């Protein structure tokens, strides 16, 4: 069964909406990638217009930006300490945009969308 991003079939009261169109391909959705803290795994997905999207399924490293020196550095991720998207993601070690990660250089906030971009970019928190 396909995941759709269209309007639901039922109203909040439980009554049914009247159908005015069929399901369309552009309404197609996918399940989240839920990027984990493990050995690097990447999945390339075909999107509309024969474009591609890189799904990062798991990774151990992050591209860390230091605002003081204004330089990037690739560092190893130790653990995920906070995730504003879902509090249960912390114990499952799932990374999303806005997550706070503990790295070799200290704590950092993820600025990229790992499930969409295929990389983990982060900014060092002082």
Predicted regions and their residues:
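Ribosome-associated RNA-binding proteins
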Residues: 1-126
């Amino acid at each position: 069964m396909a995941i759709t991003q269209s309007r639901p079939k039922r109203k909040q009261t439980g009554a049914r909406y009247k159908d005015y169109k069929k399901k369309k391909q552009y309404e197609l959705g996918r399940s989240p990638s839920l990027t984990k803290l493990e050995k690097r795994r990447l999945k390339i997905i075909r999107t509309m217009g024969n474009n591609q999207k890189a799904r990062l399924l798991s990774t151990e490293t992050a591209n860390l930006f230091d605002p003081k020196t204004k330089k990037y550095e690739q560092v190893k991720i130790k653990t995920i300490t906070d995730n504003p998207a879902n509090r249960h993601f912390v114990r499952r070690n799932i990374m999303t945009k806005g997550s706070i990660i503990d790295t070799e250089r200290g704590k950092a906030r993820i600025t990229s969308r790992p499930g969409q971009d295929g990389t983990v970019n982060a900014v060092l928190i002082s």
